[in-house]
Amino acid sequence: MTTLLQINASINNDNSQSSRLANQFVAAFRDRHPDAKIVSRHVAANEPVPHLDGERFGAFIAPPEARSAAQHAVVAYSDSLINELQRADVIVLGLPMYNFGVPSQLKAYFDHIARAGVTFKYSDKGPVGLLTGKKAYVFAARGGLYVGTPLDTQTSYVRDFLRFVGISDVEFVYAEGLNVSPQSKEAGLAKAAAEIARLAA
């Protein structure tokens, strides 16, 4: 049975354009794969992922036998996020752009799943990702027009991070110009909808 993990990163939950795009794809995927297991994770709304601080980082690097109860709880939370990824065959990310970057809660999520020896390992040829054999779809919603410009650091950051943990098969779908004008918004959403239909076919 195929497992799809949907990660929505908007602070506006399902009311955001990025979440709506991701939801559209997941609905189409479910229609084509009725037996698929769908798992949802909202990293910025409902129960936001905590930001990394010294105490949380210390929990990750402490030897298991030396961890306090609080540190064990931090690692257990990280493990639960990682386990979702490990079990997933398909990953869907709803990605808004906030001030040219990713939501800070998504960065916090990445910080909790990038664990040496768990999701990647070091080798004499560089880091090796361990979350292999997965397909990822990223649905990015932006108010302006950024694809192909130096301001689109978001795409390379997300692609590089996913590759770092072993997820190299990644497709991006963009809905851009959503705040430029009503016509631009309509065109941007229509283009994204066409891409979703193509990917879900």
What is the role of each PLM region?
Residues 147-201:
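Glycine-rich phosphate/pyrophosphate-binding loop and the adjoining helix
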Residues 13, 47, 145, 179-181:
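Flexible, glycine-rich phosphate/dinucleotide-binding loops
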Residues 71-156:
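Helix-loop-strand module that forms the ligand-binding subsite of alpha/beta enzymes
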Residues 1-95, 102-104, 108-111, 194-201:
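N-terminal beta1-alpha1-beta2 submodule of the flavodoxin-like/Rossmannoid cofactor-binding fold
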Residues 30, 114, 166:
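Hydrophobic/aromatic-lined pockets within catalytic cores
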Residues 34, 133-134, 167:
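A short helix->loop->beta-strand "cap" motif at the edges of active sites that frequently abuts
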Residues 5, 39-41, 137-139, 171-173:
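Hydrophobic/aromatic beta-strand patches that form the interior of the parallel beta-sheet core
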Residues 10-13, 97, 142, 176:
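Residue-level signal for short, function-critical loop segments
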